[in-house]
């Protein structure tokens, strides 16, 4: 099992975030628990966003190294 936040896989974080969203959407969560879950979800969301941004930068570098044309650019962000 992962011991550090950095060791947790993207897919595991995404699944955890989906579970939090389902729990909050159910409405069966006490207010204090809902706030805690929301805060946890926001932290996971930031981690996922950072991971995606790093992956995007890596792909841009790889494509750039291979001197291949691409319609993709780091400026074209749809989020």
From Swiss-Prot:
GO terms for molecular function: exodeoxyribonuclease VII activity. One of its GO terms (biological process) is DNA catabolic process. Keywords: Cytoplasm, Exonuclease, Hydrolase, Nuclease. One of its GO terms (cellular component) is exodeoxyribonuclease VII complex. It comes from the Bacteria. It is found in: Cytoplasm. It catalyses: Exonucleolytic cleavage in either 5'- to 3'- or 3'- to 5'-direction to yield nucleoside 5'-phosphates. Gene3D superfamilies: Exonuclease VII, small subunit. Its EC number is 3.1.11.6. InterPro entries: Exonuc_VII_S (IPR003761), Exonuc_VII_ssu_sf (IPR037004). Its main location: cytoplasm. HAMAP family: Exonuc_7_S. PANTHER family: EXODEOXYRIBONUCLEASE 7 SMALL SUBUNIT. Bidirectionally degrades single-stranded DNA into large acid-insoluble oligonucleotides, which are then degraded further into small acid-soluble oligonucleotides. Belongs to the XseB family. Heterooligomer composed of large and small subunits. This is Exodeoxyribonuclease 7 small subunit. The lineage of its organism: Bacteria, Bacillati, Bacillota, Bacilli, Lactobacillales.
